Amino acid sequence: MPATALPTALQETLRAAPLADALQAVLNHFECQAGTYHRMHDGALQLVVSLHIPPPVVSLIQQVPVGKGIAGLAAERREPVSLCNLQTDDSGQARPAAKVTGMEGSLAVPAISTDGTLQGVLGIAKASAYDWSDAEKAAVCTAAAILSSR
């Protein structure tokens, strides 16, 4: 999906604003209540910024191994991982502690740079159950790609 799928103001915010402001802009655009951005560092995902994530969860997600939880799976697969309802999910994709967030409709997408390198993972979530459309997943991937260029 072309970057034009995101409003110009959001694209500019993603490129230049402090990361917390950029993440909040993504949450606002997709009508989400919580989010995270992890960067790849030494083969694992390191938390860079989180918004509206309970402190006990933040302490658990400071470092996420590739392949663990939905962020780690998005990194491993290099594709979006979504859950309609994190609270009732029994697929094994989410870590049990993720339920503490109180979020339901969750989406994690890889942040891939223009040279194809995995730079991190952008995660967003809604407080209610939600099925993410392919177009929405692609738009969040665009947002993550812009973040990866920072």
What does each model-found stretch correspond to?
Residues 1-17, 119:
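Signal-transmission linkers at sensory-effector interfaces
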Residues 8-13, 20-29, 73, 77, ...:
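Amphipathic alpha-helical regulatory segments at dimerization interfaces
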Residues 11-48, 58:
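Helix-loop-beta substructure at the N-terminus of cytosolic sensory domains
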Residues 40, 44, 56-89:
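Regulatory sensory and allosteric helical modules in signal-transduction proteins
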Residues 55-57, 84-105:
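Signal-transducing coupling segments at domain and membrane junctions
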Residues 104-113:
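A short, aliphatic-rich beta-strand micro-motif
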Residues 112-118, 127:
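Flexible loop/coil segments at beta-strand boundaries within sensory signal-transduction domains
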Residues 125-143, 150:
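Regulatory loop-to-helix N-cap segments in sensory/regulatory domains
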